[in-house]
């Protein structure tokens, strides 16, 4: 038996890739970004293994991999490969695959496509309601990263399932995030009890409570809810803005010359004398609701002295889509809170919620 094939048989974390590589991964998570290449196969026929390897021919396993563009481990767990990253696809019966050269659909034990679609439905059930409150309780940045992986898998698979009967356990890290519903439920019930409302006992009642009761003017401000649920994380997907401001972009209703992002910021801050001016601007920010009404879209952030400045694009004026506004977040060492803007493109970070 070929040495690489023996390593594959000895370790479930060793995968055969559809480009001939044999790789070892640290753990078989839904989205594998990095792995160790331990060798490459140059032939893909029955000379690689003996008749006891599968019930059929090992060559047929490679035919399956190449025709379906899938990578496999010894237990039949399959991954799609895209840009050298691997996305979990499902599990197939390799013994059955080794006996045939076509008709693979009925040989799959399950498809991750179905599992991930079920995950999307479960998480979206909450996120599509009161975005500001629910994002805080579910640690939006972490969940959004995982849902991004889900969307990638769905795109690779070319569609999605509506199978509502699946009970296959979703990966532990996502389940742990979804498990935070219990803690959030306690916060909501505490708020409702203080206001003389009935407590909620299940997910549907929680959704109703979010829709009907958790409004700032009746219960409490969103910022306080965020503090109680412990959302303190700066969005991971927010990029640092460096280099020149794009041509044609307007800055505070004036055309920007050849400014860098830092220079554009200083042009505004210099009106109030440098860093001390930025502190003054923090105190002068208009109320949250007025800013939210402008439907700002977060573009990225600038590091300026000890501050993190969030740059947002305004969508208020249809003839001025490139208008940018600078929103002043709190000190970088302080806690930041986030919620999705009215256009649901956000989230936007506001320092004054602290």
Curated annotation (Swiss-Prot):
Superkingdom, taxonomy of origin: Viruses
Subunit structure: Interacts with capsid protein; this interaction may play a role in vector transmission of the virus.
Reported function: Involved in transmission of the virus by the vector nematode Paratrichodorus pachydermus.
Name of this protein: 40 kDa protein
Organism: Tobacco rattle virus (isolate PpK20) (TRV)
Organism taxonomic ancestry: Viruses, Riboviria, Orthornavirae, Kitrinoviricota, Alsuviricetes
């Amino acid at each position: 038996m070929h040495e690489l094939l023996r390593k594959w048989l000895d370790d479930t974390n060793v995968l055969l890739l559809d480009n001939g590589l044999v790789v070892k991964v640290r753990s078989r998570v839904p989205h594998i970004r990095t792995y160790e290449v331990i060798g490459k196969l140059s032939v893909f026929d029955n000379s690689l293994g003996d008749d006891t390897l599968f019930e059929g021919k090992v060559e047929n396993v490679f035919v399956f991999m190449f025709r379906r563009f899938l990578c496999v481990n010894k237990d039949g767990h399959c991954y799609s490969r895209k840009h050298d990253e691997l996305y979990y696809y499902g599990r197939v019966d390799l013994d059955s695959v080794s006996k045939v050269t076509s008709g693979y659909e009925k040989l799959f034990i399950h498809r991750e496509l179905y599992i991930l679609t079920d995950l999307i439905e479960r998480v979206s059930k909450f996120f599509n309601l009161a975005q500001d409150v629910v994002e805080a309780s579910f640690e939006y940045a972490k969940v959004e990263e995982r849902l991004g992986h889900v969307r990638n898998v769905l795109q690779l698979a070319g569609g999605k399932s509506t199978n509502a009967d699946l009970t296959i356990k979703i990966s532990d890290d996502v389940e742990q995030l979804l498990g935070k519903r219990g803690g959030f439920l306690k916060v909501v019930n505490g708020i409702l009890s203080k206001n003389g409302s009935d407590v909620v006992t299940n997910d549907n009642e929680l959704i109703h409570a979010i829709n009907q009761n958790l409004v700032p003017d009746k219960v409490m401000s969103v910022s306080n809810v965020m503090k109680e649920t412990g959302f303190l994380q700066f969005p991971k997907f927010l990029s640092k803005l460096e280099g020149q401001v794009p041509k044609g972009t307007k800055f505070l209703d004036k055309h920007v010359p050849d400014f860098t992002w830092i220079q554009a910021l200083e042009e505004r801050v210099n009106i109030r004398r440098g860093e001390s001016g930025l502190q003054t601007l923090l105190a002068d920010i208009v109320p949250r609701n007025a800013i939210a009404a402008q439907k700002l879209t977060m573009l990225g952030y600038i590091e300026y002295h000890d501050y993190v400045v969030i740059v947002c694009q305004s969508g208020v004026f249809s003839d001025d889509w490139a208008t940018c506004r600078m929103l002043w977040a709190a000190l970088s060492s302080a806690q930041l809170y986030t919620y999705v803007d009215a256009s649901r493109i956000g989230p936007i970070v506001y320092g004054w919620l602290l």
